[in-house]
Amino acid sequence: MEQILTVLAGQPNCGKSTIFNMLTGARQYVANYPGVTVEKKAGSFVCGDTRVELVDLPGTYSLASWSPEEMAARQFIVEEDPAQIVAVLDASTLEKSLYLCLQLLEMRRPTLAVLNMMDVAAKRGIRVDADALSQALGIP
């Protein structure tokens, strides 16, 4: 069975841990304030003939700053060289999410974007065209 390393990256409170829990069946604590995921969390799941090792990186707004969370996220991506990065974008604060997403794309690793918090965005009157965003970023 093939095994690949995948990381979830995104700003605090964008739903990374919820996605991680859904995919891995883990029960990582999810709270509604920044800094909950200070350390990376790991789990796995099987998709077809592939075992996906999934790592939930600490929430961060940028890879350029020097907070412990930002350093841990950048260091993990550089040193562990994941097969793919899942950039979890908060649709309700898309501009902030895109800043980190663009930095992740600059690292030249296979990356895909997941729009999360669409319900929150809709309640705020925010509409996101996922297809146009995907085309603009050049990633699925």
Label each residue range with its predicted role.
Residues G43-D49, A72-P140:
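Conserved C-terminal guanine-recognition region of P-loop GTPase G domains, centered on the G4
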Residues M1-P68, V78-E80, Q84, E106:
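Conserved G1/Walker A P-loop phosphate-binding module
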